[in-house]
Amino acid sequence: EFPENHVDLILNLNTSIGYKKNDLKNLLRNSYTSLKKGGILIIDLMNPAFFYKNFEEQMIFNFKDYEVNQTIKINKIYNSIVSTWDVYKNNEYSKDLSRELKFKLYTTNDIICSSLYYNFTLSNISFYGDMKGNEFHENSPRLIVKITK
């Protein structure tokens, strides 16, 4: 944790939240406490609408002696995803290398509601569709959030 009112900028990049319960709320709470007045929080997320339009339910990746079968299951009601990675080495299933990832996709509504709960002001929340600052819309690949304290 950082001292209160001490930080000018907080970057949360590459969809690094969504894997643990309450991670958005924890990020916002800690950011609000740590940011100076006028400090900025940037959150880089996957745009759920773009993901739903473009994801492939099943993908196979091959490299060297390995094959990875990725299966994605989505729950649009909760904006949650389960991604299963079954790994085979020389055509033998490897339990040690296989994984299941569960994560949540956050919407603009999730961001607004959680931000207001932690005392950020609605007029200080901006959404962008990419890191170049282009307008956010349904077809934007990313959901970039800028929140100023």
From Swiss-Prot:
<protein>
    <recommendedName>
        <fullName>Uncharacterized protein in ileS 5'region</fullName>
    </recommendedName>
</protein>
<keyword id="KW-0614">Plasmid</keyword>
<dbReference type="InterPro" id="IPR029063">
    <property type="entry name" value="SAM-dependent_MTases_sf"/>
</dbReference>
